């Protein structure tokens, strides 16, 4: 067990919730917790109670450790932040209205995501963040829809201004799906793609129940499943939600059935998994019925 990892403040024990003493397996399939006996498989002398979190078929695969270990998460970039503030200030209501109409999401949802306008590239601006307001990148969405990032950007999350400190949060792929879920009145955070951002999602939503919203395509679903596995250790609770078969993603679902239907489905998931209602913050709903 020399490769088992000690828990810490950003990766607490999933059994007792404490940040010290407990050990977690390299593939996060089991925990040794000296505090909680209930639910354990057996007692390991001198270490604690063994709790099996999931049965894995990956036991023959050696865990890969890149040289230099796990890379540090990107820090706040004030140079990009200065540019973002300027672009947000330069974005008048007509640009917000135009993008709202293009995406069929509410204007309020775009304001919650701090959308700006970069005149030099004729692009809408979406800040990408970590927790605590750290800006680490900027995504540009030109009039032609071909998205790219400002030079020097790192992949971050699309985080609305009204994200609560706890409660149910819906995590989706991309800025437009994030705006769609906000339009439905849900607390939502967006990843830049389906296969990135796991660590900063876990950092941001450690005290939340998380519903990972998967796209219908195979790549999107696989990325969502990987995030679910990661958040089993790093969040208060996690489950996954898919749009109905005829819709490719959350925004497509909103366009097909309207915000009330999406909200009702989201409420049903939260009630079935955690027995609690979806608590939205500032209502961003409007349009897209």
Per-region residue spans from a language model:
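Short, surface-exposed amphipathic charged segments that create phosphate/polyanion-binding patches used
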Residues: 203-208, 249-262
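A generic structural motif
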Residues: 237-247
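Acidic beta-strand-to-loop metal/phosphate-binding motif
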Residues: 171, 208-219, 242
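Short, acidic/turn-prone active-site loops that include or flank metal/cofactor-
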Residues: 192-197, 215-218, 243-245
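Phosphate-handling DNA/RNA-contact segment within nucleic-acid enzymes
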Residues: 118-209, 224
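Acidic glycine-/aspartate-rich tracts in secreted/extracellular proteins
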Residues: 37-39
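TOPRIM metal-binding catalytic domain and adjacent DNA-binding surface shared by DnaG-type primases
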Residues: 1-22, 28, 34, 45-132, ...
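Short, aromatic/basic amphipathic alpha-helical patches
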Residues: 222-233
């Amino acid at each position: 067990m020399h490769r088992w990892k000690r828990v810490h403040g950003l990766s607490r024990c999933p059994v007792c919730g404490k940040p010290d003493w407990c050990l977690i397996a390299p593939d996060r399939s089991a925990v040794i917790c000296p505090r909680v006996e209930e639910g354990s498989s057996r007692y390991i002398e001198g270490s604690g109670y063994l709790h099996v979190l999931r049965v894995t078929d990956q036991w023959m695969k050696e865990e890969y450790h890149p040289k230099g270990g796990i890379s540090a998460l990107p820090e706040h970039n004030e140079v990009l932040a200065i540019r973002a503030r300027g672009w947000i200030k330069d974005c008048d209501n007509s640009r917000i209205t135009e993008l709202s109409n293009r995406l069929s999401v509410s204007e309020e949802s775009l304001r919650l995501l701090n959308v700006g306008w970069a005149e030099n590239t004729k692009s809408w601006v979406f800040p990408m963040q970590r927790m605590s307001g750290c800006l680490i990148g900027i995504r540009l969405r030109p009039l032609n829809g071909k998205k790219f990032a400002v030079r020097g950007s790192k992949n971050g999350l699309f985080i609305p201004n009204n994200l609560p400190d706890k409660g149910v949060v819906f995590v989706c792929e991309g800025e437009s799906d994030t705006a769609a879920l906000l339009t439905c009145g849900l607390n939502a955070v967006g990843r830049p793609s389906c296969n990135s951002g796991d660590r900063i999602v876990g950092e941001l939503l450690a005290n939340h129940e998380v519903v990972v919203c998967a796209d219908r395509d195979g790549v999107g679903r696989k990325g969502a499943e990987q995030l679910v596995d990661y958040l089993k250790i790093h969040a208060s609770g996690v489950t996954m939600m898919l749009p109905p078969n005829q819709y490719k993603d959350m925004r497509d679902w909103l366009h097909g059935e309207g915000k009330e239907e999406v909200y009702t489905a989201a409420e049903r998931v939260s009630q079935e998994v955690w027995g609690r209602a979806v608590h939205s913050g500032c209502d961003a709903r409007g349009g897209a019925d």
